[in-house]
Amino acid sequence: AVFGNVTIPLREDLSLFLGGRYSVLDKPYNYIGSTNALGAPLVFAPFTTSSGSTLKEFDPKITLEKTFDNALGWVTYTTATKSGGPGFAQWNAADASKPYEAEELEMIEFGYKAVLNDGATQVEAILYTYDYTDHQQILVGTNSQGQPAGVVVNGDATINGVELSYRTYLNENTNLALSYAGIDAEWDRFMDPRTTPSTDRAGEKMAFAPENSINLALENVQYLNIGELTSAISIVYKDKYKLALVDWEPTTVDDLTLVNLTVGLDTPSGWNISAFCNNCTDDEYKMVALSGVRAQGGGNRYGFGDGRRIGLQLSTDF
């Protein structure tokens, strides 16, 4: 890969950033399947195949940046590429010799950041749009023999979002941070091959994309004779989102609110004594989910996030 950039001052308060990266991604591979039970799933017979993918790509980055008295505004255009490659869990030479397609991304971002109240307050706002072509999705599907196998499906998607943040000192000991993220992530083209016939998921929401997320953090520091006492609370809220392509109960996370508390004392002698409570409301929520292949009987596997955890910690540096 070769990359470079230059910043061109247009005016005292206006500059243009031009950058680019040219890369050649070559992925040759050998795929070997072996078995000690001929004719039995999943590898019916031993095989060896060789294939690969080559990608030559130039990705530019252009940013126009304007400074104000206590603020900064910018607009950025950039592209990115993720190369294709060998599939996973392939049980025959025909399937193993087919690499999946490269993924392309085109992004536009508008941003504004300001420092207020003599540096005590900072606000930031970002608007962005991501345009994906051949976005890679790793699924569990079936091969030509109807056996479960790894599938990488490429689809087009558009993600539009807004991020707002506000950070300030309420007084010399207490700081507050508040942020909001809104996301509209939707498939423009996606054929799900795991059903018969395949399911067209164009217009459906993407996974791991709650439409609204809010983060609140409050921290207070007291300087005592026995050391520095820090107390903090953080609250995270996300509205309903899904963990997989299919939006149904085993793969859906309902409105989620997580509350964490910490109190810690740093002593002059270098010791830290802290107490913590993570997920204090003991919300039950899924972290990951995997939908089985319906042709193989379906089923789901999912893992939960940590429940309420309360503890004490003693540490020192030496």
Question: For the regions a protein language model found, what residue spans apply to each?
Answer:
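Signature of Gram-negative outer-membrane beta-barrel scaffolds
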Residues: 1-68, 84
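Residues on the lipid-exposed face of transmembrane beta-strands in outer-membrane beta-barrel proteins
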Residues: 2-8, 54, 62-66, 110-114, ...
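Gram-negative outer-membrane beta-barrel transporters
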Residues: 12-16, 129-131, 152-245, 315-317
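Repeated loop/turn-to-beta-strand initiation elements of outer-membrane beta-barrel proteins
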Residues: 13-16, 70-73, 118-123, 173-176, ...
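Transmembrane beta-barrel strands of outer-membrane/channel proteins
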Residues: 18-22, 75-79, 112, 123-129, ...
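Solvent-exposed loop segments that connect transmembrane elements
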Residues: 27-53, 85-99, 137-152, 187-207, ...
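Membrane-embedded beta-barrel scaffold of Gram-negative outer-membrane proteins
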Residues: 67-82, 99-169, 181, 185-188
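C-terminal beta-signal and adjacent terminal beta-strands/loops
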Residues: 176, 236-244, 265-318
